[in-house]
């Protein structure tokens, strides 16, 4: 498993109605033990979450299933994160 930082930044099309679905999406990732941490940015421009996945392709598939991203409300950037322990 690899660790990925998932950055979701609001777009001009941001719609608050998709936020509840976003949190349900994160709850599912947490139940699957993939989600390590998450939270919004203090300036309300978006947020980030950290997941574990087998590949960048799998991380992208997961990230594009996020209702905020799928709706166009947020733009997704994914970075593999080589955490030091």
UniProtKB/Swiss-Prot annotation:
InterPro entries to which the protein is assigned, alphabetical: Dimeric_a/b-barrel, YCII
Coiled coil (residue ranges): none
Similarity comment text for this entry: Belongs to the YciI family.
Protein name: Uncharacterized protein YjpA
Organism: Bacillus subtilis (strain 168)
């Amino acid at each position: 498993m690899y660790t990925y930082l998932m950055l979701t930044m609001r777009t001009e099309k941001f719609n608050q109605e998709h936020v509840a679905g976003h949190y349900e999406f994160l709850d599912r990732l947490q139940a699957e033990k993939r989600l390590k941490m998450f939270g919004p940015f203090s300036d309300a421009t978006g947020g980030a979450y950290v997941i574990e996945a087998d590949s960048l392709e799998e991380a992208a598939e997961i990230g594009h299933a996020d209702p905020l991203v799928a709706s166009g409300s947020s733009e997704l950037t994914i970075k593999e994160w080589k955490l030091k322990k």
